[in-house]
Amino acid sequence: YMIRKLNLNIGNSQSVFSIVEKERVQTMKIGIMGGTFEPIHIGHLLLGEFAYEDFGLDEIWFLPNGNPPHKETLDTEEAMHHRIEMVRLAIKSNPNFSLNLSEADTKKHSYTYQTMRHFNEIYPNDEFYFILGADSLFAFEEWKDFRKIFTTCTILAAMRDDKDASAMKGQICLLYTSPSPRDS
């Protein structure tokens, strides 16, 4: 950690604040779990855990999407607030999970390739791993500018026994998970 002193002139007085900033001395491996999380469920949390453990990730960021392009109607601000709070409550007991609101704007569409490009610009020394479920994987070619996503991160795709991803091997890393309680 690095401590930096900040001197501020406020009115006639001068205040000194100490700001603690985390200085990254090494590359971090960050997993990205995007989605509507409507609602977030145990499958999302288990997928985050599997990715964290199996690929030696440092953190998993959950990004609730406020206005996904594949949805017909826009969320209200109130509905988005509820989804954010559900995610916050679901991940709060796991110190490796954090909430990121980069895609939470309900007034415009957010696209994964733009979000990942943005993260790479802000954190150029970090490695990003975009985590997908099997259903999203098989619709991946329908995503806007999906090929650009491959240049910004490694794709971790969760597979179920009944799915075949052989056509996409070489572009993605498969994340084999145990059956979730939802699959039973």
Each PLM stretch: what is its role?
Residues 176-183:
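Conserved small/polar residues in nucleotide/adenosyl-binding loops
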Residues 5-23:
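Positively charged, low-complexity intrinsically disordered leader regions
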Residues 28-56, 61-66:
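N-terminal catalytic cores of NTP/NDP-binding nucleotidyl/phosphoryl-transfer enzymes
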Residues 166-175:
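Short, aromatic/basic amphipathic alpha-helical patches
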Residues 153-167:
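Short, flexible loop segments at boundaries between secondary-structure elements
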Residues 37-38, 67-69, 135-137, 161-163:
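Short, solvent-exposed loop/turn segments at secondary-structure junctions
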